[in-house]
Each structure stands twice: as structure tokens, then as C-alpha cells.
Amino acid sequence: MKKLIATLLLITLPVLSASAHYLWIETNGTGALGQAHEIRVHYGEYTYGVFEKVEGEAFPLVSKFTLWAIAPDGTKTPLSTVAKEDHYLASFTPSQKGVYTITLNNNEIDVIDYTQYDFGIFKTHYHSTAKILVGTDGDTKTANPDGIVIKQLENDGEVIKLQVLYKGEPIAKNELKVYVSDLWSKTLFTDDNGEVSFALPWNTKYIVETTTKEEIPGTYNGDDYEFIWHCATYCIKP
């Protein structure tokens, strides 16, 4: 039991530390019609080089996720995954020109008691997205009406424009972290429209993370909680 509790605590490092365990999607940012496109799901801390093992202690606790490919016309296709050493692997074949949005949702994570850290008792809700461009650019789709989501807006390729939505509405003045490898990070805040923009100084992978608390108590799997901690990530990979 003590071992299980210690592992559960890994899920919520963001509430106590600048570092954060989170789920994120990795995939190439461009695709081609009729060609299989791979998608990876990771759990850990990208900027610290932490990639949890699929069969380790931490990843199984957040592995009840669903994964979808949303086509430019809005068609949603569920994606099955295969467990690898440090990620889950999925694949699909684009059949339309435009922007494909890959979405991951996990609202099935056990309640955690952090009263000893003066944080409370809460439930975690993860949501992740990634963009695949097949020809014509545009906005990514959103598919998380019950939580927080990061939406990429159409851009010129030099400056990334994002919008953070909570239950379908823009969330203003919300903190957003941008990570790359080797411990580099940048903190930004959304404007009144929930939007934020930033340049990409390096040709590398970027992980964006933002969180919010839903101060409504409830019960999950027989355990009461005081609030829901929502975490959204977005992967930018050239």
C-alpha cells in the first residue's frame, strides 16, 4: 500500500513543484495523404528527459486514456494503441487535406489525498492534443467540453498562436508553460481572449502545458474529492 501511495503522488507533482508529470502526444507536425502516420503517447517530464515505462509504477495509473484522430471535416476516428517500452504507439492514414487534430483524454484517475501538503483531496483530468498538417493550414479542433484544452490557431509558421479553453470558453490570465529539452522553459499568460503567441527559436520539439482547478466537490470510484485538477498539454513538433 505504501508503495502504491508513493506512486500515485507522482501523478500530481505539478501542485508542489515547478516540474510536472503529464501525459503528452508526440507526432510529426506534417503528414501526407494515403501514408500511415505514427502517434506516440508519453507520460513523464519531457524537459527533464523523464519518460515513464509503460509497465512501470506510474504509467499504469494514467493509462485509461482514449485517443482520437479528428479529420478536417470533423470526423472522429478512435485510435487503438500498442504498448511499447516507454510509450503507447498508434497509427492512422490521412484521407483529407487540411488539419488533423489528435486528441487524448483521461478522466479516469483515482482520487488523491494531499491534505498533508495543504492542497486538499482531488481528482485529476488530463487532456492532450497535437496538430498534423496535410496541405492547407487551419485551426485545430477541440474535443474536451468537460475540461481544459489547448487549441492552435492558424499561423504563418514563424509565430505560434494558441488559445486555451475551459469547458468551451476562453480562459483569461491563465498560466501556460512552454518546455523544450535540457531544462529550458518559458512562462506565459493568456490574454482576455484566452490567447497567447510565441516564436519558435529552435527547430525542435516543444511541449506546452496549462492547468486549472475546478472547485466543485464530487465522488469518483467511491472516494470523495474537493476539486478536479485539469491539465492540458500540446505538442509542437516540426
Predicted regions mapped to residue ranges:
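Sec-dependent N-terminal signal peptides
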Residues: 4-14
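N-terminal soluble domains immediately following signal/targeting peptides that reside
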Residues: 21-238
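Sec/Tat signal peptide C-region and signal peptidase I cleavage site
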Residues: 15-20
